[in-house]
């Protein structure tokens, strides 16, 4: 099953399309995304361009790449004179718009290469500055972004709403979807372990025991996967690219290895195949729940 356009699907285990990519395949997708904007319409085009790849994989790659692009350029959009120019352009156009057409916002965020949700945040922040006579609180700003009906200007509220639902990388809707998808994959992992009658402790149980930094799963009895011992499993509902995997290694995976021993990372939406190079050091990568799990107690009963 594919998710709705621009959203991630949790049915990754049964998706036959490629999720483990060579670096060359990954770079081909990245090159094509460089000139794209983070809208659901662009995701439809991306899906048509690479039909052999999971839509969830493509969206995850696109989102990671666009976020890198945004981090490099976001500071220039936050300059006071730039925000003022965006807002004045909006005010001039909004006065002359009789309908709730999205033509202005669509034109603006395409021209300046800023995601719809981030542009909406800048415009709303500036609008509230006039309305309240000072800098609005983040609480008020965030509540209006999540619930645009709270915005007193109905035309602006409609624009904010449309920007939020049209953005596939940023905004409260995307944040909510990503959080839900992450939790669903953790539940999926637990269900798979229970199907195999494997005893484990989940993250909540481990924290209750006093652990502060833990993987999603600690196996009470280690298993072997493709000949490698696994003590813990980490679930990642994203694509594993060079930058994110390097960050996870430094901030999470090696600390898990130091404390709990070798483990398994599941990138449910795929990863660059060349990154699976730490197996001998104790970190195994997969893009689905492994089918060849061997429990150590079972292995001990095998004849020599």
Please name every model-derived segment.
Residues 158-208:
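Acidic-basic catalytic patches of nuclease active cores, encompassing PD-(D/E)XK
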Residues 207-216:
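Beta-rich nucleic-acid/ligand-interaction surfaces
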Residues 27-37, 192, 290-304:
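Eukaryotic low-complexity, intrinsically disordered regulatory segments enriched in serine, proline
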Residues 189, 193, 215-242:
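Conserved catalytic cores of phosphodiester-cleaving nucleases, focusing on short active-site segments
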Residues 269-304:
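Domain-level recognition of nuclease-like catalytic cores that cleave nucleotide substrates
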Residues 1-158:
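Nuclease-adjacent, charged terminal/linker segments that flank catalytic cores
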Residues 202-203, 265, 285:
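A structural preference for short, hydrophobic beta-strand core positions in alpha/beta folds
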Residues 230-231, 235-280:
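Catalytic cores of nucleic-acid endonucleases
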